[in-house]
């Protein structure tokens, strides 16, 4: 798996009105914008992650039909229902966990997802490490950083990030490939 910069292109006001029939055209537009970003940045290649939480079946099918293969999910249980039957149909599918992860859901998360973007505390890092070893999987992980330093949001505060990343890499042997920042 190559290391990519994640580019999230979103517009809240357009998201609710975007018709399924326009999805392919919108994906093509976003892919053109990513291609422009690629041409100006040789070190990292942006990847388009389609956030599929709460999306109806027909929208996900339209995205898949239009060639989208990287999806972000917020909840483990919803992702299991949504993607279990599709995994066999789309072997190149990449699922990313982008929502909070409770330690009691780690077994299922490691089994289902290809990337974990929400490593935010030592207990979770240790649990992920143990479960990945048990399942024989070594998933790329992102450390979640709470850049806004807001107590109601998850994530490591910026001044603790270096120490936590070292813990994840050195003590837990996690493959930390980047940061997922929450403003």
Regions found by a protein language model. Give the residues of each.
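Conserved alpha/beta-domain cores
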Residues: 2-183
């Amino acid at each position: 798996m190559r290391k990519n910069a994640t580019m999230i292109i979103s517009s809240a006001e357009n998201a609710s009105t975007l018709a399924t029939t326009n999805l392919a055209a919108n994906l093509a537009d976003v892919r053109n914008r990513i291609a422009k970003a690629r041409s100006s940045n040789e070190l990292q290649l942006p990847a388009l992650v389609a956030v599929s939480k709460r999306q109806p079946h027909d929208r996900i099918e339209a995205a898949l039909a239009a060639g989208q293969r990287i999806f972000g999910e917020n909840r483990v249980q919803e992702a299991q229902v949504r993607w279990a039957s599709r995994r066999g149909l789309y072997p190149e599918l990449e699922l990313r966990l982008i929502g909070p992860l409770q330690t009691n859901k780690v077994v299922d998360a490691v089994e289902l997802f290809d990337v974990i973007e929400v490593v935010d505390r030592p207990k979770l890092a240790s649990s992920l490490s143990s479960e990945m070893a048990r399942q024989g999987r070594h998933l790329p992980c992102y450390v979640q950083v709470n850049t806004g330093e807001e107590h109601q949001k998850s994530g490591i505060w910026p001044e603790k990030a270096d120490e936590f990343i070292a813990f994840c890499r050195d003590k837990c042997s996690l493959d930390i490939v980047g940061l997922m920042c929450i403003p």
